Regions:
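Conserved, charged catalytic cores of large soluble enzymes
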Residues: 1-14, 30-204, 243, 247-248, ...
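Basic, alpha-helical terminal appendages of large translation-related enzymes
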Residues: 1-3, 43, 47, 119-124, ...
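Structured secondary-structure scaffolds
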Residues: 1-40, 45-46, 98-102, 149-150, ...
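Short, solvent-exposed positions on alpha-helices
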Residues: 67, 355, 403-410, 454, ...
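A glycine-rich phosphate-binding loop feature that marks nucleotide/adenosyl-phosphate handling sites
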Residues: 125-129, 292-294, 344-348, 379-384, ...
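Non-transmembrane, amphipathic alpha-helical segments
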Residues: 345, 349, 381, 397-400, ...
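Aromatic-residue-lined binding/catalytic grooves and analogous aromatic/hydrophobic interfacial grooves
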Residues: 366, 405, 450
Length: 513
């Protein structure tokens, strides 16, 4: 059986997750569910990045210890992932003892190889990013250096610290980016490659003085320092599947891994991560999937921008996790930023889920119950419907294997529209025995339900159980293979949402938290 390891970034739990976190996590979950559906053995990892100055300050603000703070926030994140029906196999925390041991051992090994050394450093530092910015990387606001991500003033820091010899890996990183297809879409690899060629690679700090950042994993040979949060966090991808602790499981899954990240952390996940892996004699990941930003009010959605959209708003408004997941995945774009408005999300939900899919399921279910007492036996499927089903399945599998979830959903919608056109043309409600038409419609609904199941797992389960069919791999789907549909109810899956009040500008914006 083919193995696949899927990861999200691990998230800073300094605040509850919002739509930006959900955007990444739901996409990774859809990939995991799809790959399980087609028969692959999947291990899906997500979790929290729990060390560093930002966490330390957040805990101080609440008057509790960092450990108490991250314990509380781990529970919060897990609750949100339950809310969105995220099917992770393991939730990693960088305060887990096994992870801390792996990080400590990796740091020690690189020091013994001469790849980590001690030196003085001075530079502009962003607490939120937990990294230094060199000239050319930060932006000037009123002649003061600001973080290009968070738009906050940078802090000038001078300290003696430990460095990783990133500069020694320029040729390796260049070759990896230019000669492999690891980074997807490939435009992101070109972006990093251009920067590497223009600027070269500088050695990077991998530790902080303990008197400034006490909340971290101690440097194993120097207790006056803690390990830099990015070095610590990146290693979760290997510690989470057994590196240095369970070699059999590590070998089972690595390097057949799909990392899913946002483009804001591209540099660390290419240049730094690939170099760390090479330094530790670990093969690079099979795929680094990079997605664009969700934009609201012209800015990347984020707490610092004050434009976050709460996850609970999405789940409540779109009738549960399935509706929220579908809207996010239809918006999903790997290489173009997406402007988010309630009007846009409402339109997607109402037209595609409530009307095209939900209404069709309801109409066919009610008709079958009324006309044939819910029992629809196998008949020859209408040729046009059969062709539409097979075309949609073929394109859907191609798109999903190519990691293009939104495009795959468009193929499902085309089939849904064809089925709605068919029911209006053949008018089964006017026939005394519409079994042939109903069977064709039910085969189409079965195909749509199978294809939507990674995105709308709860609704797909309800429909398959209510109509009496199994959710099979889209690769194994055979039109006309169901002997009998036994419809026990016609569920109302997705109730339409009503327009909210408009803002003074006339355009509706989601609530922020």
């Amino acid at each position: 059986m083919e193995r696949l390891y899927i990861t999200t970034p691990i998230y800073y739990p300094n605040a509850p997750p919002h739509i930006g976190h959900a955007y990444t996590t739901v996409y990774a979950d859809v990939l995991a569910r799809y790959n399980r559906l087609v028969g692959r053995k999947v291990f899906f990892l997500t979790g929290n990045d729990e060390h560093g100055l930002k966490i330390q300050r957040a805990a101080e603000k609440e008057g509790i210890t960092p450990k108490e703070f991250v314990d509380k926030m781990a529970g919060v994140y897990r609750q949100y992932w339950v809310m969105l029906n995220i099917s992770y196999d393991h939730f990693i925390r960088t305060t887990d003892s096994y992870h801390e041991k792996v990080v400590s051992e990796a740091f020690k090994r690189l020091h013994e190889k001469g790849l980590i050394y001690k030196a003085k450093y001075a530079g502009w530092y962003c607490v939120d990013c937990e990294r230094y910015y060199s000239p050319g990387e930060y932006v000037l606001v009123d002649d003061k250096p600001h973080c290009p991500i968070h738009n906050k003033p940078l802090e000038w820091l001078e300290e003696e610290t430990y460095y990783f010899k990133l500069s020694e890996f320029k040729d390796y990183v260049t070759k990896t980016l230019s000669e492999t297809d690891i980074v997807y879409p490939p435009s992101y690899a070109k972006e990093v490659l251009n920067r590497v060629q223009a600027e070269g690679l500088r050695d990077v700090s991998v530790a902080r003085p303990k008197d400034r950042v006490a909340w971290g994993i101690p440097v194993p040979f120097d207790p006056d320092y803690t390990i830099y949060v990015w070095f610590d966090a990146l290693l979760n991808y290997v510690s989470g599947i057994g590196y240095l602790t369970d070699d059999a499981r590590f070998q089972e899954y690595w390097p057949n891994v799909h990392h899913v990240i946002g483009k804001d952390i591209l540099w660390f996940h290419t240049v730094v991560w690939f170099s760390l892996l090479k330094a530790l004699d670990i093969s690079p990941p099979r795929r680094l999937i990079v997605h664009s930003f969700l934009i609201n009010r012209g800015l990347k959605i984020g707490k610092s921008a004050g434009n976050v959209i709460p996850i609970e708003f999405l789940v409540e408004r779109y009738n549960g996790s399935d509706g929220a997941r579908y809207v996010l995945m239809k918006l999903f774009n790997l290489d173009k930023d997406v402007e988010v408005t309630i009007d846009l999300m409402d339109s997607i939900y109402n037209s595609e889920l409530a009307d095209t899919y939900g209404n069709l399921v309801r109409r066919v279910g009610v008709l079958a119950a009324k006309k044939v007492k819910g029992k629809v036996y196998r008949r020859d499927v209408d040729k046009k419907i059969e062709e539409s089903i097979e075309t949609a399945l073929g394109k859907y599998v191609e798109d999903m294997e190519s990691l293009e979830v939104s495009k795959a959903l468009s193929e499902v919608q085309e089939l849904g529209k064809a089925l709605n056109t068919y029911i209006n043309e053949v008018k089964p409600w006017e026939k005394s025995d519409p079994s042939k038409e109903l069977y064709s419609l039910l085969e189409g609904i079965r195909a749509v339900t199978v294809m939507l199941s990674p995105v709308t797992p709860r609704a797909s389960t309800v429909i398959s159980e209510s109509f009496g069919f199994k959710l099979v791999s889209p690769r194994d789907f055979k039109v006309g293979s169901v002997e009998r549909y036994n419809i026990v109810e016609a569920p109302i899956l997705f109730r339409k949402v009503q327009a909210r009040r408009e803002s003074q500008s006339g355009e509706e914006s989601p609530p922020s938290s």
